[in-house]
């Protein structure tokens, strides 16, 4: 039974049991009452078992099914490195807090049964794990340590706080310092450590590439494509055939460019722009990947499984094989390419007054980089202008239209967080040699604005056609978090209006505009971001809070995102007149799982990308232990505060390193306060720090505060003295 059918039948049986006329009965009696054929009674048991596991239904002492009195809840346990955890329960707005003493052997990602604590009437519910229903992790990436008679493995993921005991005969010859994949054979209980066996040796921790591969393995990212898939890809032509172009709009004589980063190889969007009178005609042309990835083929199944390309600091793990992503699907200059185009007529106020979505064939004139376009439009570089003189008028129009679109978006309340992304420069050996923020400039904003309007236009079109679709949605923030934010910003003289327990995005946008350039900007921006929910993929268009729009989707990146590829199939079925009732039912049945899985794979990719960035930042700062930097306090917790440097590196100043006073954490104002000196360390405050230590295994950086009255050279000496005492 597939997931959709199981959910449907669970609802039906649960409604039946909840009916006021229901009399408790056994499974066999229920089958008779509901006229379930004998051939389908196993399916009824599957549904009843699922409802029991969910805690919605209980079995009485006489073996009869009754509605649960709410004694038990079922969910997935998320562990915290400090021992406590949270359980996510379907239907509950907030996760349930599990104190460290009440986890009862539950490990990260386990599915557990819990009871709510009697004192769980506060703002956050608390519970106790009463039963582990299923284990969520079978294998872990660890660092192996060997002793004379046994070995043990230290998990890379700090959420798994316990070491794993490895009998020597199950170590596969691993030595101390090896990165290994460990399969858990015994999860341990009553204080006994988990036990496991080494199933793969990735390499020694000091070997080049082992660090990144450990993260790849840890997140179970698929690296290689199967022979079956590669054989399928071999049969794909390197050129667009006449048959492929037949019946498409031919736009090859339109002046067309791609604008991407210098290193990009998977070019999936191209732009055309003309202006007649008061109307702009913007063409956003997206690689027609669905022409080469047939639905339900081995290649399609693998693409769905991956969900997205993963951009790690030293490599790309693509959703599609390179022959497609960098070859026939990539909109390379001078080559005929198949596209799905959204061509929009836009007035001078930024309104899309007409649009066409069509299958097209295009030929890109020039492959532009963000740097080149920036030089032309911002720096007026003579050499660049001469090199691309035939395109300069179009670039000027692009700048003009992007500003109009952005102004319209901002007017309706779209929120723009301008946090710098990190660019880590590696040498040939994979060592980080520089870390700097990505340059967000006029060229990157042009592409951003054009992709946004195309995604919005396509989503609105298909919403009103009432066809099955995958939308990109962003729910309104949690009311309690917004109220907490409102209380905090009052300390700085700012207010936000919350109407009927909801906030309009324009309120947050106005707040960000007010704090622009102020000392508290970083502080309030971060807290505002933390108050918001994650965007996700859904089959219902509930709107996008952050963009302040009712309709949004991801249409523009089918080479690297599966939802975009899925949308392209739906659009092409519709354009070709194939969207009959059978196809509608087909999409209705598969899209909920596509949306859910794609959201999960996006989060996995984001986490893996963050971890590789953290790893290389630690490696970079390892060479700078003892150096002094100025940074900004970016987070405050009871165990210390985090400081972010201008190059985006973040480290922890542990509360125990603040030796000039005893500091306590004031949660309401996000600050550390010295009890004797009344000295404050708060979010957004500038501080000088010295790099005290780094840990590549835990991927952490430790800072110590440099007092204002101490010269940098003296601070280094003081730090050396402290470190020597710690290691003596």
Where is each model-derived feature located?
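Charge-lined substrate channels and their catalytic hotspots, especially those that engage the 3′ end
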Residues: 1-283, 290-336, 374-375, 671-672, ...
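Intrinsically disordered, low-complexity mixed-charge segments
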Residues: 1-7, 11-14, 23-24, 707-728
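Electropositive polyanion-binding surfaces
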Residues: 32, 181, 186-188, 212-217, ...
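A short macromolecule-binding patch
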Residues: 94-99, 160-166, 649-665, 713-718
């Amino acid at each position: 039974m597939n997931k959709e059918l199981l959910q449907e039948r669970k609802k039906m049986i649960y409604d039946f049991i909840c009916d006021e006329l229901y009399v408790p009965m056994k499974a066999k009696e229920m089958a008779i009452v509901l006229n379930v054929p004998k051939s389908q009674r196993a399916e009824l048991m599957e549904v009843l078992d699922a409802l029991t596991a969910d805690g919605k239904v209980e079995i009485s002492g006489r073996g009869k099914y009754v509605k649960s009195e709410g004694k038990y809840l079922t969910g997935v346990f998320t562990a915290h490195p400090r021992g406590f955890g949270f359980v996510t329960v379907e239907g509950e707005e907030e996760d349930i807090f599990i104190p460290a003493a009440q986890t009862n052997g539950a490990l990260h990602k386990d599915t557990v049964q819990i009871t709510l604590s009697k004192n769980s009437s506060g703002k956050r519910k608390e519970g106790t794990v009463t039963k582990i229903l299923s284990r969520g992790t079978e294998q872990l990436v660890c660092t192996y340590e060997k002793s004379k008679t046994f070995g043990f493995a230290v998990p890379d993921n700090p959420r798994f706080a316990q070491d794993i005991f490895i009998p020597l005969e199950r170590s596969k010859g691993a030595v101390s310092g090896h990165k290994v994949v460990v399969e858990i054979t015994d999860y341990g209980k009553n204080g006994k450590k988990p036990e496991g066996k080494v199933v793969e040796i990735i390499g020694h921790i000091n070997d080049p590439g082992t660090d990144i591969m450990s993260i790849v393995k840890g997140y179970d990212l698929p690296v290689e494509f199967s022979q079956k898939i590669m054989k399928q890809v071999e049969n794909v032509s390197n050129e667009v055939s006449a048959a492929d172009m037949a019946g498409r709009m031919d736009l090859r004589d339109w002046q067309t460019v791609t604008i991407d980063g210098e290193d990009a190889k998977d070019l999936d969007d191209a732009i055309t722009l003309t202006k007649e009178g008061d109307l702009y005609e913007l063409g956003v042309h997206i690689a027609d990947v669905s022409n080469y990835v047939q639905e339900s083929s081995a290649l399609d199944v693998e693409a769905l499984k991956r969900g997205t390309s993963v951009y790690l600091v030293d490599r790309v793990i693509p959703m599609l094989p390179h022959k497609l992503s960098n070859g026939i699907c990539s909109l390379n200059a001078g080559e005929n390419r198949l596209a799905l185009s959204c061509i929009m007529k836009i007035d001078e106020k930024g309104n899309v007054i007409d649009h066409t979505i069509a299958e097209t064939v295009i030929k890109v004139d020039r492959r532009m980089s963000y740097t080149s376009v920036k030089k032309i439009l911002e720096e007026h570089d003579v050499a660049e202008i001469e090199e691309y003189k035939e395109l300069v008028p179009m670039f000027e129009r692009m700048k003009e239209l992007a500003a109009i679109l952005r102004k319209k978006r901002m007017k309706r309340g779209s929120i723009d967080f301008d946090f710098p992304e990190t660019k880590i420069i590696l040498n040939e050996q994979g060592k980080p040699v520089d870390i700097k923020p990505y340059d967000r400039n006029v060229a990157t904003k042009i592409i951003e604005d054009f992709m946004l309007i195309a995604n919005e236009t396509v989503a609105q079109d298909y919403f009103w056609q009432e066809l099955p679709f995958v939308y990109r949605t962003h729910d309104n923030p949690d009311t309690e978090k917004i109220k907490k934010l409102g209380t905090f910003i009052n300390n700085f003289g700012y207010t936000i209006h919350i109407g009927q327990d909801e906030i309009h995005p324009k309120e947050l946008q106005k707040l960000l505009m007010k704090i622009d350039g102020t000392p508290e900007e970083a502080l309030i921006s971060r807290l505002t971001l933390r108050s918001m929910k994650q965007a996700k993929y859904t089959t219902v268009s509930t709107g996008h809070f952050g963009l302040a729009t009712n309709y949004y989707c991801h249409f523009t990146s089918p080479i690297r995102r599966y939802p975009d590829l899925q949308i392209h199939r739906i659009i092409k079925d519709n354009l070709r007149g194939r969207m009959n009732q059978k196809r509608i039912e087909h999409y209705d049945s598969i899209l909920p799982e596509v949306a859910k899985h794609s959201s999960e794979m996006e989060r996995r990719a984001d986490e893996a990308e963050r971890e590789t960035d953290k790893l290389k930042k630690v490696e970079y700062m390892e060479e700078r232990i003892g150096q002094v930097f100025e940074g900004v306090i970016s987070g405050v917790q009871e165990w210390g505060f985090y400081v972010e440097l201008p190059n985006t590196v973040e480290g922890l100043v542990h509360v125990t390193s603040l030796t000039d006073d005893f500091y306590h954490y004031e949660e309401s104002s996000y600050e550390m306060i010295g009890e004797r000196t009344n000295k404050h360390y708060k979010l957004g405050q500038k501080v000088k720090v010295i790099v005290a230590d780094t840990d590549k295994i835990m991927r952490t950086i430790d800072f110590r505060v440099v007092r204002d009255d101490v010269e940098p050279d003296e601070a280094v000496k003081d730090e050396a003295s402290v470190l020597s005492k710690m290691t003596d």
